């Protein structure tokens, strides 16, 4: 016959087990999606608008090897960042920007260029079961000799899609490239075919 004390211990054990299991279930499981880098340029600047997962980058999860945040041993760190409100996350990203910037390579005419962070916008997604997008806006100074550029970022940041925005081009002429993690883009020429086709009214 189970004594009263043994019964209490068993009861507490069951309660604690249920609590721990519930905690595990509520851990966020977010699919890792490719980032998207939209770029456009004029005579003075090359501009980027990159849609990414800021929590993923800040937590140092290697997105080149997994497709879900729960597959990483750093998932608890990711979850901690996901619980931050948008202002806290924006401030933290800005604080870490110098380190993040060192993992982004944009070369103009095959030479590394200075990248300026213009601003960051965190989407306000209150459902923690859903990953939230962040937008970072970058600019790189161009000059009259700037002919082409390449883009590459740290493989741990995962795959990224490069997309050109240019109202002077028809859709078929716009540059698009899917980059595997850590792979450098082809050379992208800044003023090649920089006009609308004569067939477009």
Q: Would you name each region that the model predicts?
A:
Residues 2-12:
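Bacterial N-terminal signal peptides that target proteins for export
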Residues 11-14, 35:
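Intrinsically disordered, low-complexity segments enriched in polar/charged small residues
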Residues 15-17, 27:
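Cleavable N-terminal signal peptides
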Residues 28-200:
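N-terminal soluble domains immediately following signal/targeting peptides that reside
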């Amino acid at each position: 016959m189970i004594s009263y004390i043994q019964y209490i211990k068993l009861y507490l054990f069951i309660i604690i087990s249920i609590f721990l299991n519930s905690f595990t279930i509520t851990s966020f499981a977010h699919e890792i999606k490719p980032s998207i880098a939209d770029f456009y340029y004029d005579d003075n600047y090359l501009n980027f608008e990159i849609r990414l997962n800021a929590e993923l980058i800040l937590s140092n999860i290697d997105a080149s090897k997994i497709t879900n945040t729960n597959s990483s041993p750093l998932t608890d760190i990711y979850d901690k960042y996901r619980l931050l409100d948008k202002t806290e996350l924006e401030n933290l990203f800005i604080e870490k920007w110098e380190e993040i910037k060192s993992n982004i390579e944009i070369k103009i005419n095959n030479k590394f260029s200075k990248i300026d962070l213009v601003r960051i916008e965190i989407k306000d997604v209150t459902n923690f079961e859903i990953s939230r997008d962040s937008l970072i806006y970058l600019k790189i100074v161009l000059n009259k000799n700037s002919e082409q550029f390449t883009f590459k970022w740290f493989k741990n940041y995962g795959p990224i899609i490069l997309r050109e925005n240019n109202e002077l081009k028809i859709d078929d002429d716009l540059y698009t490239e899917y980059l595997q993690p850590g792979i450098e883009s082809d050379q992208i020429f800044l003023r090649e075919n920089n006009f609308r086709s004569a067939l477009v009214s």
